Design a protein with these regions (language model features):
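N-terminal membrane-anchoring/stem segments of glycan-assembly enzymes
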Residues: 1-12, 65, 69
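Cell-envelope/extracellular polymer assembly enzymes that use nucleotide-activated donors
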Residues: 15-17, 49
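Short, well-formed alpha-helical segments that are part of the catalytic scaffolds
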Residues: 25-39
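Short, acidic, metal-binding catalytic loop of nucleotide-sugar glycosyltransferases
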Residues: 35-47, 122
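A conserved acidic beta->alpha catalytic loop
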Residues: 53-61, 78
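Long helical/loop segments within the catalytic core of UDP-sugar-dependent glycosyltransferases
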Residues: 73-95, 109-191
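Short aromatic/hydrophobic "clamp" motif used to bind/position activated sugar donors
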Residues: 98
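The conserved acidic donor/metal-binding loop of glycosyltransferases
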Residues: 102-106
Length: 192
């Protein structure tokens, strides 16, 4: 299932909340992800609202978020794991679109420019109270690429010789599944 990428005028791009979920990841690893998110391209950068969603409520992560000029939502009790972490953030944000990233993911600079256009007409119809009678897009899931070794690579000391298992799954297996109407949704992956 493929869609033709819509051409959208720059002034039509809506606000988007970028949520980075973290649970005990090292602040040094988080720095790379947060920093990359701040460099994502968008026609009006004031419409991109980046938040670190920390379900362990760590002071050093709140400080890092502040240093990088992004928002921070701490969750003290880790209630409902990652979904609880995201729900906590969603109760405090209001953009019509949400992009999610795991703590160990670095988005491409063009991530928002390549995903948001598919939603613009729907967002405008919703905001104007109009009916939207075209095919609707509810979620765009992009291939998952980590910059740290997965558990198999790490345990086999083969970070440089084996492909990342998650990378292989999202770029090969899930693409095949999608072509047969059976793609899997994986929370935290790079979504809008």
């Amino acid at each position: 299932f493929e869609l033709e990428e819509p051409e959208i005028a720059k002034e039509r791009y809506p606000d988007v909340d970028v949520l980075i979920a973290t649970h005990n990841e090292d602040p040094e690893l988080l720095y790379k992800t947060i920093n990359a998110c701040t460099f994502m391209e968008y026609p009006d950068k004031s419409k991109v609202h980046i938040y670190v969603c920390d379900d362990t409520n760590r002071l050093e992560v709140a400080k890092l978020a502040d240093e990088l000029g992004v928002g921070y939502f701490g969750l003290a009790d880790n209630k409902d794991a990652k979904s609880g972490n995201y729900n906590n953030a969603l109760r405090q944000t209001s953009s019509p679109l949400v992009a999610t990233f795991d703590a160990d993911m670095i988005p491409y600079r063009e991530f928002l420019l390549e995903t948001v256009p598919y939603f613009v007409e729907q967002v405008e119809a919703y905001e104007n109270g109009d009916d939207y009678d075209k095919s609707k897009v509810g979620l765009i899931q992009t291939p998952q690429s980590f910059y740290n070794a997965d558990i198999f690579q790490f345990n086999l000391f083969s970070e440089s010789t084996l492909p990342n298992e998650q990378d292989f799954f999202s770029k090969e297996i899930n693409v095949f599944n999608n072509s047969h109407g059976a793609a899997l949704y994986k929370i935290g992956r790079a979504h809008v």
